[in-house]
């Protein structure tokens, strides 16, 4: 029976993945004129050349998890990042995409907002004066919303200690002499904020979706729009037409949340059917990951990095074929460009930037200004098929790093993303977990799974964790058809009054864990 159940679970996951991909491809509601459409990129000029204009860069950091009880080096390294790394790279802006604090109890089983963690986070920002050096845009993650009964609660420390100081999604415009670039945040944290593990998924209701649609329309005249949030789109519950449709005019959606799935998926990148890139960045908490991104003549490039590794290199022209999209970018500019362009940063001065294409040494790039290095080239020499470009950078202290990627100046050539990464980022995991929950009585007929569920319940009840859940309102549903339209007030969680019956939320909390472990094995 257990084997049959396992096969059914696997078949259900496979069917859900195929259904999600088909729905992603064909959509549920068809084209909608009310949704912002991808802009027609200007082409083919200005093309990347010998000038130092038409370029800016930024950073993303996510899942910092400043902790009162664990790994003080997270905060120590964050302070170094805000001083040393920021001073060297000098980004135009930094996107801190959620889980700024850990918000766990000492034994790590429960959750609680720890004000000292927020004070530590804010003190780092103030001590390093990072908000004077760059635009620091920090947003909430699920950990930052644990145990918060309402946004007006004194426990909502995000309002008091963050750089942004306000809840909800927002639109930031980076103005340059060569155009405007929009950055739209997606706040899908739950309100009220339940305890762990019930806070894994994000939720957007109808009102929030309308607000995001307005922000998308505001950005339609910008050169590019980047959306950023904590949750992957696959872990956000949203009403029709869905969050991916709302952000379809964006070049990319930058997020965190999944922590490289415990190191099993260090690269979680994919592309929505509408062309928007979804780029999850690894966590700062355990892996000290961060990301550099740039717009060079409206061509978007990025590189995922490990803190403390120098030199940092980003090839901005020619850009990577895998992350190219003619719906959002003027890719013809690569063919009309006159120079290969590289950003290079290090603790010591850069002494050499060597460029190779298909293993052939093209020579040393020359320093233009700041971190920009250029090398004259003729892209028409590479007009057929795909090619590999490599940049090797060395500094005066002897540090050396190389990066490479596949590029093409030919149209209608595409590369595909890792299928497992696409499955993780494009499948509607909320729907899958909900279907598991609906079939839970059948699952409980299995003695092994019944014991596992009971064990999970004992863990959640340990040290009266459930009694600490916000008591004013516990939302067990949402305002759109993915869940029943149910809002209930519980003076004490129902599973405490009814020990023999698992609450729906407890079922979901267990099942998403079971589901994710089963998915990646």
Which residues does each predicted region cover?
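Active-site glycine-centered loops adjacent to acidic/histidine catalytic or metal-binding residues
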Residues: 63, 98-99, 141-142, 230, ...
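Acidic-and-aromatic substrate-binding clefts and catalytic sites of carbohydrate-active enzymes
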Residues: 67-75, 111-112, 233-237
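A short, flexible beta-alpha/helix-coil linker loop
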Residues: 64-67, 100-103, 189-193, 234
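Short acidic, glycine-rich surface-loop motifs adjacent to enzyme active sites
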Residues: 97, 216-235
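Post-signal peptide N-terminal segment of secreted/secretory-pathway proteins
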Residues: 97, 105-106
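Residue-level marker for buried hydrophobic side chains located in beta-strands
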Residues: 58-60, 94-96, 138, 227, ...
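Extended active-site neighborhood of metal-dependent phosphoesterases/phosphodiesterases
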Residues: 25-50, 106-223, 238-252, 258-305
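Acidic, histidine-bearing metal-coordination/catalytic regions of metal-dependent phosphoesterases
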Residues: 1-93, 126-128, 132-135, 310-521
């Amino acid at each position: 029976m257990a084997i049959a159940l396992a096969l059914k679970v696997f078949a259900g996951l496979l069917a859900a993945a195929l259904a999600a991909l088909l729905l992603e491809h064909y959509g549920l509601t068809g084209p909608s004129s009310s949704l912002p459409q991808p802009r027609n990129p200007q082409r083919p000029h200005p093309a990347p050349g010998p000038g130092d204009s038409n370029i800016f860069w930024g950073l993303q950091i996510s899942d910092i998890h400043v902790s009162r009880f664990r790994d003080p080096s997270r905060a120590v390294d964050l302070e170094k990042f805000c001083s040393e790394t920021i001073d060297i790279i000098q980004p135009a802006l930094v996107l801190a995409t959620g889980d700024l604090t850990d918000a766990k109890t000492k034994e790590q089983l429960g959750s609680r907002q720890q004000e000292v963690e927020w004070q530590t986070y804010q003190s780092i920002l103030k001590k390093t004066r990072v908000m004077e050096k760059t635009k620091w845009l920090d947003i909430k993650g699920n950990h930052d919303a644990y145990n918060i009964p309402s946004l007006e609660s004194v426990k909502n420390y995000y309002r008091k200690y963050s750089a942004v100081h306000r809840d909800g999604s927002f639109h930031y415009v980076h103005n340059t002499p060569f155009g405007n670039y929009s950055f739209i945040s997606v706040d899908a944290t739950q309100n009220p904020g339940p305890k762990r593990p019930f806070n894994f998924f994000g939720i957007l209701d109808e009102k929030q979706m309308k607000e995001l649609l307005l922000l998308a329309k505001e950005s339609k005249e910008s050169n590019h729009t980047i959306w950023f949030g904590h949750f992957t789109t696959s872990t956000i519950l949203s009403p029709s037409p869905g969050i991916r449709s709302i952000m379809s005019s964006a070049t990319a959606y930058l997020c965190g949340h999944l922590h490289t799935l415990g190191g099993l998926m260090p690269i979680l990148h994919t592309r929505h059917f509408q062309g928007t890139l979804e780029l999850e960045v690894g966590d700062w908490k355990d892996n000290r990951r961060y990301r550099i991104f740039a717009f060079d003549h409206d061509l978007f490039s990025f590189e995922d990095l490990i803190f403390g590794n120098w030199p940092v290199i980003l090839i901005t022209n020619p850009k990577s074929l895998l992350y190219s999209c003619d719906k959002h970018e003027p890719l013809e500019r690569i063919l009309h460009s006159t120079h290969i362009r590289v950003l290079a940063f290090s603790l010591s001065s850069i002494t050499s930037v060597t460029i190779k294409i298909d293993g052939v040494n093209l020579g040393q790039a020359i320093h233009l200004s700041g971190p920009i290095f250029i090398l004259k080239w003729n892209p028409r020499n590479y007009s057929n098929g795909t090619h590999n470009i490599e940049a090797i950078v060395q500094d005066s202290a002897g540090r050396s790093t190389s990066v490479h990627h596949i590029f093409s100046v030919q149209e209608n050539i595409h590369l595909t993303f890792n299928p497992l990464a696409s499955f993780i980022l494009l499948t509607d995991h909320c729907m899958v977990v909900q279907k598991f929950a609906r079939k839970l009585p059948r699952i409980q007929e299995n003695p092994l799974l019944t014991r596992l569920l009971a064990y999970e319940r004992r863990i959640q009840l340990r040290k009266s964790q459930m009694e600490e859940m916000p008591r004013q309102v516990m939302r067990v549903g949402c305002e759109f058809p993915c869940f029943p339209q149910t809002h209930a007030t519980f003076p004490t969680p129902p599973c405490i009054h009814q020990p023999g019956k698992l609450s729906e939320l407890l079922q979901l909390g267990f099942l998403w864990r079971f589901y994710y472990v089963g998915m990646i094995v």
